[in-house]
């Protein structure tokens, strides 16, 4: 039986896969697993809930809070707030757990629930397995004064988070480091529709806001980091210095330069890593990336005296490696960037602020900064209906990969990744030219299809 928890919590079609009953049961199970006595100033257990702008978030947040409060937790409902805002508040308010109701960049009908432990860190697999193990089980729940209360305080929670974000680039509290910078902010009609524009304005930027009118149904719809075209067009039309685009729960950010050219997560990480090294804040002069990061980033950073450490795909694995090796910066090509100086998870709004700050500090345009991190030409082919697990053991496939890697040398690479949810293998190649990347990928994809066919 597959795990209920995926790589980023529990997700599914709201009211079909993810029902009110399941949300209640998850809240009930989570209090049993995550409740502790450490760090509490009173004898009450506390949890915090936040959500994105999906209409289904209403009933799911009520159900989740019901499960938690029935289990004896006082619940603070922070309302609509970015996922990293919940992580921050879980830490700063010293509550025992935080929970986010969001399906991130997925379409509106989907939703999800994920948890943060005390301190604002995502749960390890072992804790998720414990929650799943007790899900729906009966237990001796509290009665009388032992049951929890639910309070609603969106304004205080949001302002605490915005203050924290701005302080990352304006530590004195009254500076306006982004004064004179014109920025387009595409909020994906999602959780940062209030937070990102306000944080950028407080930092002094001239902000043009688009896709920040959530109605419960338009989250991620032709907007945000998965559909940045409207942001790119607005940058060109308005003469802005740059644009930033977030996803539905604002844990990721992509950017565009003044000409509307996209700047991806790899380039953003490169820019921020170099800035941190200059300031003496890049621990061990190392950036943590995933296997999907472009080889061009690694080669450019090497020239700058910056090493890279590679993990599997997923910001949770990036964070695990950052904690293990005491690294200060890491992330993914998709725009998840974790800046451990200020956050315990990927934070799109923080990424936007620090990127804008580096544009101002450097005196260079975003186009100039991004040009220092050229991306090698890349090709990706999904090969369906194959035995995906055999991709790592099949002799013919492994020999073919070795041949291609030898041909590419130091200016290219090959990656075979089994899908986590489908019977397919992703075949990716990077090379000095697009033609070479296309040819390598085509040859390998054919061998994978022939050798691993179901």
Curated annotation (Swiss-Prot):
One term under GO cellular component: cytosol
Binding-site residues for Mg(2+), renumbered to this chain: 104, 247, 249, 251
Processing and modification events after translation: Activated by phosphorylation.
Known EC number: 5.4.2.10
GO molecular function: magnesium ion binding; phosphoglucosamine mutase activity; phosphomannomutase activity
Keyword annotations of the record: Isomerase, Magnesium, Metal-binding, Phosphoprotein
Active-site feature positions: 104 (phosphoserine intermediate)
GO BP: carbohydrate metabolic process; peptidoglycan biosynthetic process; UDP-N-acetylglucosamine biosynthetic process
Class in the EC hierarchy, top level: isomerase
Family annotation (SUPFAM superfamilies): Phosphoglucomutase, C-terminal domain, Phosphoglucomutase, first 3 domains
Residues that bear Phosphoserine: 104
Reaction(s) catalysed (UniProt annotation): alpha-D-glucosamine 1-phosphate = D-glucosamine 6-phosphate
Cofactor(s) needed by this chain: Mg(2+)
Cofactor, how bound (note): Binds 1 Mg(2+) ion per subunit.
PANTHER family: PHOSPHOGLUCOMUTASE (ALPHA-D-GLUCOSE-1,6-BISPHOSPHATE-DEPENDENT), PHOSPHOHEXOSE MUTASE
Family affiliation: Belongs to the phosphohexose mutase family.
Its job: Catalyzes the conversion of glucosamine-6-phosphate to glucosamine-1-phosphate.
Name this protein carries in UniProt: Phosphoglucosamine mutase
Gene from which the chain derives: glmM
């Amino acid at each position: 039986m597959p795990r209920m928890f995926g790589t980023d919590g529990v997700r599914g079609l709201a009211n079909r896969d993810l029902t009110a009953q399941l949300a209640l049961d998850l809240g009930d199970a989570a209090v049993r697993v995550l409740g502790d006595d450490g760090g509490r100033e009173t004898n009450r257990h506390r949890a915090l809930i936040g959500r994105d702008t999906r209409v289904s978030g209403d009933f799911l947040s009520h159900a989740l809070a019901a499960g938690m409060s029935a289990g004896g937790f006082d619940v603070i409902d922070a309302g609509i707030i970015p996922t990293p805002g919940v992580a921050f508040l879980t830490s700063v308010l010293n509550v025992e757990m935080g929970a986010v109701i969001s399906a991130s960049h997925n379409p509106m009908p989907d939703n999800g629930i994920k948890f943060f432990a005390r301190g604002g860190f995502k749960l390890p697999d072992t804790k998720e397995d414990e929650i799943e193990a007790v899900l729906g089980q009966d237990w001796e729940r509290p009665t009388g004064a032992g049951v929890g209360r639910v309070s609603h305080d969106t304004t205080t929670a949001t302002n605490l988070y915005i203050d924290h974000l701005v302080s990352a680039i304006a530590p004195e509290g009254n500076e306006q480091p982004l004064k004179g910078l014109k920025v387009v902010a595409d909020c994906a009609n999602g959780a940062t529709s209030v937070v990102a524009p306000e944080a950028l304005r407080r930092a002094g930027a001239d902000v043009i806001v688009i896709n920040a009118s959530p109605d419960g149904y338009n989250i991620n719809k032709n907007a945000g980091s998965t559909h940045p075209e409207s942001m790119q067009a607005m940058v060109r039309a308005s003469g802005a210095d740059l644009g930033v685009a977030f996803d539905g729960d604002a844990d990721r950010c992509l950017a565009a330069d003044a000409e509307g050219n996209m700047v991806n997560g790899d380039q953003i990480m490169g820019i921020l890593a170099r800035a941190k090294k200059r300031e003496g804040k890049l621990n061990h002069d190392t950036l943590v990336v995933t296997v999907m990061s472009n080889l061009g980033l690694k080669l450019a950073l090497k020239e700058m005296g910056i090493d890279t450490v590679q993990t599997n795909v997923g910001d949770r694995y990036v964070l695990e490696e950052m904690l293990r090796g005491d690294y200060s910066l890491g992330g993914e090509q998709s725009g998840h960037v974790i800046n451990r100086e200020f956050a315990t998870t990927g934070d799109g709004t923080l990424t936007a602020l620090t990127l804008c700050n580096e544009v101002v500090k450097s005196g260079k345009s975003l186009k100039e900064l991004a040009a220092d991190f050229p991306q090698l030409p890349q090709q990706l082919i999904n090969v369906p209906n194959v035995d995906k697990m055999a991709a790592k053991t099949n002799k013919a496939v492994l020999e073919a990969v070795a041949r291609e890697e030898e041909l590419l040398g130091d200016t290219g690479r090959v990656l075979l990744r089994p899908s986590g949810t489908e019977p397919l293998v992703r075949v990716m190649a990077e090379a000095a030219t697009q033609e070479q990347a296309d040819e390598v990928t085509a040859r390998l994809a054919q061998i994978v299809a022939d050798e691993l066919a179901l």
